[in-house]
């Protein structure tokens, strides 16, 4: 009996010890679980903070913001941040480069210029950049569009400056061929558009538009652009090029861009650099006269002769300004019209001293509001 009791008490002792040990382990396990949970919570909190910080960095990163500006708003890009520009001087190299680009299905735009670039030219480059992957800006002082007594030899040139400006505006390629490259010895072929070139600048500058049509046709053939961008300041030139493209079934879209003006209203032109301060002041009368014609139209005047006369009267007040022509014409055909029924363009050419300036304004009859 005593042995049995002893055996039971031993088992009871072990059980009690086991229970006590189990209790201790459970207590320790509980503490461990709590510690693990606390650590996990801390980790989660840190991760959450890190994620927020990362998100914040992604949204407000100056590097990413500046990238967006380059793509969406090229006008804000400084010259240092702009992409590089390639300079090509031969027709062979120009064609080779564009063949490589077309294998990547890239859209090509052309901006033809004679150089000495100003903001008017650069606005064309920026528009081309918006519409195409590759922007080719040509700088070529075309001898074919200058008359014998005109300013070919003294026309302003600054190729290095033009290159910097084009790079900042987003042009991809500067195409600057020499005259001997573009018109080699023995050159005998010319392109001439009739009809729209008969009057105005075509009458006062014989051969001018033949030179324009020839150089533009050659550029289109060399570069084969998807689109070409021209300014509306040379309005007769723009109409001539559109007629050239239409008549010869050239596969290129012509984009016309509004005239860019100085603060005083003078249309930007490379030839403005010829003007003295006094002449510059008198030259602003051209745009004042054009605006006067627009006001007269808005006030009810429809007679084309009266609209032209109001421009002439204002221009004749300037001592050094000699009027070459003022005409109210159809926007498509450039035919003079007796009255403005819907739309028209007023064309002006004048000399201020020795400098010939052109400008224009588009008129549109205001629609009457229905009552």
Give the label of every model feature segment.
Residues 2-8, 14, 22-25, 31, ...:
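Nucleotidyltransferase catalytic core that binds NTPs
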Residues 19, 29-52:
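Compositionally biased, intrinsically disordered low-complexity segments enriched
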Residues 339-344:
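A short, glycine/Asx- and small/polar-enriched loop/turn
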Residues 345-371:
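Generic C-terminus detector
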């Amino acid at each position: 009996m005593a042995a049995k009791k002893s055996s039971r008490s031993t088992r009871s002792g072990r059980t009690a010890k086991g229970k006590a040990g189990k209790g201790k382990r459970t207590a320790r396990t509980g503490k461990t679980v709590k510690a693990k949970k606390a650590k996990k919570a801390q980790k989660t909190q840190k991760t959450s903070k890190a994620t927020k910080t990362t998100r914040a960095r992604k949204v407000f990163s100056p590097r990413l913001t500046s990238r967006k500006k380059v793509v969406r708003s090229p006008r804000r890009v400084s010259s240092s941040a702009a992409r590089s520009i390639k300079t090509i001087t031969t027709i062979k190299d120009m064609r080779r480069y564009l063949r490589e680009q077309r294998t990547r299905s890239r859209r090509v735009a052309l901006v033809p210029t004679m150089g000495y670039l100003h903001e008017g030219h650069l606005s064309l480059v920026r528009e081309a950049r918006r519409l195409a992957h590759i922007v080719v800006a040509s700088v070529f002082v075309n001898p074919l569009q200058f008359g014998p007594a005109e300013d070919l030899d003294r026309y302003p040139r600054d190729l290095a400056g033009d290159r910097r400006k084009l790079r900042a505006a987003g042009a991809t390629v500067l195409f600057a061929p020499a005259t001997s490259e573009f018109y080699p010895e023995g050159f005998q072929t010319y392109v001439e558009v009739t009809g729209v070139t008969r009057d105005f600048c075509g009458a006062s500058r014989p051969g001018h538009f033949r030179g324009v049509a020839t150089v533009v046709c050659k550029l289109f053939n060399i570069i084969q652009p998807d689109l070409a961008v021209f300014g509306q300041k040379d309005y007769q030139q723009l109409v001539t090029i559109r007629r050239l493209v239409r008549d010869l079934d050239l596969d290129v879209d012509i984009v016309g861009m509004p005239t860019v003006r100085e603060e005083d209203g003078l249309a930007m032109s490379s030839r403005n650099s010829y003007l003295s301060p006094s002449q510059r002041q008198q030259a602003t009368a051209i745009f004042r006269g054009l605006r006067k014609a627009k006001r007269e139209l808005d006030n009810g005047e429809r007679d084309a002769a009266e609209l032209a006369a109001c421009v002439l009267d204002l221009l004749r007040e300037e001592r050094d300004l000699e009027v070459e022509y003022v005409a109210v014409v159809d926007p498509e055909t450039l035919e003079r019209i007796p009255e403005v029924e819907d739309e028209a363009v007023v064309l002006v050419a004048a000399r201020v001293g020795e400098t010939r300036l052109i400008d224009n304004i588009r008129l549109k009859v205001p629609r009457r509001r229905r009552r």
